[in-house]
């Protein structure tokens, strides 16, 4: 890519292609990590209700703003609607809590986290609820169609509280259905993307609809070692011999190669690190030039292995089949 941003439909907002992911940042480290990330140069922060650290993310952001390091308009803040709040009765209440938790006046992008409407869980019972089922033995679904949920997101845009809305972990059919009734078109699709799982057909079709793409889990199984069997057993892309060969050729890290691979496909990326050196390195990817041989090497790693799959968490939900 020749630019450092993706232009979003409808608003024309510039979404940075190099972002910082807030998943799995411990609450005790989160405020300082986000603050340091802003000092390092990050301007997009990707969060979610489900990550359980929105209060701390907000503190880090507001600390940087209050110290004059950045202005709010310099930042692009993303968060997500969790599954248990899909009902039209609960969307706005969760959104308002997320704004309050982060101490912000608006979000730049608000995403539906999964196309999975689960039974409502009162925040007084547990928050964030995750894939909570209480005393039940399986997931409990809510009778809440996506079109009602999306209409509530559109109202949030109308109120000036979210500049853009989009979806995560949606397949082609779910997006196709959404496009038949959406008054405000989704600006972004966020999905798992890496050389093991390039999802070329979905990516091509989504781009043809004018929807931009954010890639998560750019390093493959790294974030899933403690969550799934495939996360434990699959070779880390950061340690893969083929990725190392490309990295050695360009005198960069394997992480930088994987992020550059994504940028070359016009995906925004949201890696996370609490290590200052890696945090800086993950930003320094614009000048890396992968050639045709490099891309052939990386493309050969395709296995279609997905790591963020509710089926592998024991929920019996074949979401991506």
Swiss-Prot record:
InterPro entries per UniProt: AKR, Aldo/ket_reductase_CS, NADP_OxRdtase_dom, NADP_OxRdtase_dom_sf
Keyword Transferase present in the record's keywords: the answer is: no
Q: Which GO terms describe its biological process?
A: trisporic acid biosynthetic process
What pathway does this protein act in? Answer: Pheromone biosynthesis; trisporate biosynthesis
Active-site residues per Swiss-Prot or TrEMBL entry: 51
Task: Give the protein's biological function.
Answer: Catalyzes the NADP-dependent oxidation of (+) mating-type specific precursor 4-dihydromethyl-trisporate to methyl-trisporate.
Listed name of the protein:
4-dihydromethyl-trisporate dehydrogenase
Q: Which gene encodes it?
A: tdh
